[in-house]
Amino acid sequence: MYIIIMGAGRIGTLVARMLESEGHDVAIIEMNRERAREISEYVSGLVIEGDATDQKVLENANIKNADAFAALTGRDDANILACILAKHLNPKIMTILRITDPGKKKIFEEVKELKRYFDIVVSPEDIAANYIFRTLVTPGFDRVLLPREGAEIIQFQVNEDCEVAGKPIKELNLPKDSLIIAVYDEKGNLVIPSGDTVIPKKGQVIIFAKNSALQDVKKIMEKKREE
């Protein structure tokens, strides 16, 4: 994919480097001259000094042939305008809008007249706050938040002391709003599990669970074997 990123701040830079590491072509548009020069040393793609709300700048970035455009600056108004302009120049492009005010996020997701300009709306601040909250409320495991679904993908380390070790999944009595989606043994071999899959005595278990089921899942997966 060819992706254009607006903004070379911490988020924009991190996203660009992650995309490049996966083999995608990336261009970054940054207004600040010093920052544009600095970021060019860290990414292999095109870095353009300019304003992404300017049509000529987007055209110089080859917007008409881009697969996606991500407006990731800390300025909501500029991000909004740039996404609208990107859609105007390339109606098939996927747009990702960063909103710093979580309160505005629902407006862009629910108002039909706005949704056609913004394919994905993200609020890093909202995600970070959610992550901190969930970690405080249910600490103790690695997680990936899925705010829209009200769920998380969580990872548990398993060893011989865990009560679940050596048991088939169908005997774990996990809550109905949870599902084991992957099991790794000690050597890192992946198993897509069924009910008969046995939890290894040492390894990792990946579980998809709704927030309402997290506490029960945690109790089951972290319970120690009685001596």
Swiss-Prot record:
Binding residues annotated for NAD(+), in chain numbering: G7, A8, G9, R10, I11, E30, D51, T73, G74, R98
Residues of the RCK C-terminal domain: 141-223
A molecular function (GO) term: potassium ion transmembrane transporter activity
GO terms for cellular component: plasma membrane
Keyword annotations: Ion transport, NAD, Potassium, Potassium transport, Transport
Positions of the RCK N-terminal domain: 1-122
Entries under Pfam families matching the protein: TrkA_C, TrkA_N
Function: Part of a potassium transport system.
Domain comment, as recorded: The RCK N-terminal domain binds NAD and possibly other effectors. This is expected to cause a conformation change that regulates potassium transport.
Protein name per the record: Trk system potassium uptake protein TrkA homolog
Species in which this protein is naturally found: Pyrococcus abyssi (strain GE5 / Orsay)
